[in-house]
Amino acid sequence: MQLPHYSQLKQQQCRRDRRSLALLLAFLVLTLVVSLCAGERWIWPTAWLDDAQQLFVWQLRLPRTLAVMLVGASLAMSGTVMQAVFDNPLAEPGLLGVANGAGVALVLTVLLGQGLLPVWVLSLSAIAGALLITFLLLHFARRHISNTRLLLIGIALGIICSAVMTWAVYFSTSLDLRQLMYWMMGGFSGIDWRHGWLMLTLLPLLLWLSRQGTVLNGLTLGEIQARQLGIPVYRWRTVLVLVMGVQVGLSVALAGIIAFIGLIIPHMLRLCGLTDQRYLLTGCALAGGGVLLLADTVARVALNSAELPIGVVTATQGSPWFIWLLLRNRL
């Protein structure tokens, strides 16, 4: 009698998860529409095809909106993967220094290249920096140190990278590098269709990662249980770290360092009952894109004469969550 009962519970959970994904999809569509409407001038959807509004909507706002959505999805999914791979509920690209590693590589490349290098070289340097920090963290994680120490190591690496970026900007006379430092606070100003190749590179990685829920379910059980299930743990960790590093590097190349999205989104969804990684990954992509679209809209319209760095908005949103998670996990 227990098997039918278990089967019914599993079916009910699947239906709840699908309903949650449907609600998250509706939330993403709503925030996408608001993002396209909002700006110095509010443009209703009925006016999007007007000749006078096409430049604002299709050439300026649409590429930015797509970039925000993809970066939000990338950071939220990367946070979910990091929490599973490192077995640390507080792991996320910004907090563990991965995004800062991408940023310092980008700044040093601009400094050494004197602002003359093409965008694809800067993107590759950001990816390399993110991968370097991620593999360092993976090395420490394999030494079975505590979650607290791994968290502190990640924070220390992030502080070191931030210090290097600050020194580079302080001693630089290049206006490009000073503007880049402002951009490293997080922002999507200047995004247009010329950055479309970065978005197209990010999209297949997101789609592939969203299909790896079964593997992540095994990894969350622990290394021994995962091996008993036939999962090649070392190989999957390496592959997931590579994909995650590339995603974070591309995200930093597009928008700079944006913290806390990878931390708060997975925990919010888990608190809402979305615990199966097969649904959680997709949910993180939808929720991450929607939340970052909201933050970007706030950053654009909060001030009349300027634009807030989106990293400031997400840090304001995420800092209370981080404190709460620290207290909840008694670290």
Curated annotation (Swiss-Prot):
Quaternary assembly: The complex is composed of two ATP-binding proteins (BtuD), two transmembrane proteins (BtuC) and a solute-binding protein (BtuF).
Record's bilayer topology term: Multi-pass membrane protein
Keyword presence, Transmembrane helix: yes
Subcellular location, principal: membrane
Subcellular location: Cell inner membrane
Any single GO CC term annotated in Swiss-Prot or TrEMBL for this entry: plasma membrane
Gene3D superfamilies attached to this UniProt entry: ABC transporter involved in vitamin B12 uptake, BtuC
Keyword Cell division: no
PANTHER family on file: FERRIC ENTEROBACTIN TRANSPORT SYSTEM PERMEASE PROTEIN, VITAMIN B12 IMPORT SYSTEM PERMEASE PROTEIN BTUC
Protein's name in the database: Vitamin B12 import system permease protein BtuC
Membrane spanning residue stretches: 21-43, 63-85, 90-112, 116-138, 151-173, 193-210, 239-261
Keywords, ordered alphabetically: Cell inner membrane, Cell membrane, Membrane, Transmembrane, Transmembrane helix, Transport
Taxonomic source organism: Pectobacterium atrosepticum (strain SCRI 1043 / ATCC BAA-672) (Erwinia carotovora subsp. atroseptica)
Pfam families reported in the protein's UniProt record: FecCD (PF01032)
